[in-house]
Amino acid sequence: VGIIFKSYESLKSIQAYARQSEESGFSGGFWIAEAYHWFRQYGLEARGCFTTLAAATMATRTIPIGLVITSPYMRHPTIQASECAAIDELSNGRFIMGIGVGKVGIEYLEYDTDKMKPVPVHHESMEIMRRIFSGRQFSYKGEFFESSMPPFDRATGGLRTEIPIYVGATGPFMQRLAGRESDGMLLAGLTSPAFVRYARDNMRKGAEQAGRTLPADFPVGGVILAACSKDGAKAKTATRSYTGTYIVNKLRNIKNDTILAGSGLPDSSWDPFRKAIADGTQDKVAHLVTDEMQRRFTVISG
């Protein structure tokens, strides 16, 4: 079990949360999800995800530090690799890199994901980053990215030559890519047991395609909204708006969504949210989130 925060929290708060997570024994890591400036509509200000990770790293000593996720559509793999290497050095080898499409973040950018298909984009990004981590000389020219670099002896300098890369995977093609090439798979918000089973099955198919045998403890992580309070009603309220935001996100950005289907709720349950999207009121949907939806998607103590 780990802890995840978005990078719209203040850096001092992030450091306090990271220390508390480490002291509480969360062995699954302290993770940062990249926030974007559209969170201002909720009164929140985005910070740079790597700077936020650095703040968490400086406040801790042993807990794994992870990024879940940043998008290869937003940063060239060479830039991603440089940022990874810096955080990994700062953390003494505790860093885990996570990459994923991040549709919410790139919807304001002029990327055509129908032409720049996510699977090859992420494949090429991992290829380049791993070659940079290795320190070996290389020249790479892919369909979307290219890079060439002279050698550098990272190992002698005490730097890791293999930094784990996890893939954020919502759909079956990205889940198969995770099985073929990644060091771990990250699932999106509103993860449910049924969706985990679905994703792991696709991941295994991808591994089989590559002739790869995944260990039983191959990392698979999912984002689960959680709130703790002595007052159960207050805990429900704390997660209700976020649950609504995630539901809208899935309906807007993912075709043939399997996350919502995995909840076991009928498809008609999401019709009020679809109407809100059509009406332009998708930012005010907390009241549409039922107790049953929260039971399927969240962990509430109180």
Language-model features, listed with the residues they occupy:
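Active-site mouth loops of central-metabolism enzymes
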Residues: V1-K12, V68-T78, L159-T170, A226-A227, ...
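Hydrophobic faces of well-ordered beta-strands that scaffold small-molecule active sites
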Residues: V1-F5, G28-I32, P64-V68, F95-I99, ...
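Generic structural signal for well-ordered alpha-helices
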Residues: Q15-R19, F50-T57, A81-A85, V119-R130, ...
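Short, acidic/polar
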Residues: S10-S21, Q80-E83, A169-L177, T239, ...
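N-terminal beta1-alpha1-beta2 module of alpha/beta enzyme domains
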Residues: V1-G66, I163
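Acidic (Asp/Glu)-rich catalytic clusters
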Residues: R19-E23, L53-T62, C84-R94, G179, ...
